Amino acid sequence: MEKSKALRFGGAFVLAVLVATWAPIGFTQSDPHSGTWTLSVDKSKYTPGPAPKSQTTVYTVTAQAVKMTSTQVTAAGATQTTEFSANFDGKDYPVTGTPDYDTTSAKRVNANTIEFTRKKAGKVVQTATSVVAADGKSRNVTVTGVNQAGQKLNNASVYVKK
C-alpha cells in the first residue's frame, strides 16, 4: 500500500511540475510587436521620399530579442528584403538587405515600444522608434537620420496588423 501512495504522490508531483512549466508558455500573451504588418502607404509620410509601393514586415519578439524580416517594393519597382535578429542589450547586430545601414541595436522602452539605432560602417545614421497602438491593430514607426545618399530623412510609417 505504501508503494501505491508513493506512486500517486510522484505522479501528482510530475503533473504539477508539467503544469507549472507549460502554463506560462501556453497562456502568456504574445508580444504586441510580433506578427505580420502591412504598410499603409496612404497614411505614411516619407521625407524626402519617395515612399515604397508596398511593404510587409514580420516581427518575432521575445522578452530578450527581436527578429525582423521586411520585404518592400521600392518606388522604382525593385523588391528589397531586409533582415536582422537583435537582442535587447544595446549591442550592434548585422543587418542584410538594405543599403542604408549594416547594423542595428535594439532597446525595449516599454511593452509597446522598441527603439533601434542603425549604423553604417560603425557610424550612427538612423534612429527608429516602433510603437504598437494600445489596441494592437496598428504600429507607427518614425525614422530620422540620413539615407544612403546622405539626404536627411524623417519618415512616419503606419502599419496595420494582418
Region spans (language model):
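Intrinsic-disorder/low-complexity peptide segments enriched for small residues
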Residues: 5, 13-16, 37
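Sequence-pattern detector for short linear motifs
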Residues: 8-11, 142
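Bacterial N-terminal signal peptides
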Residues: 10-22
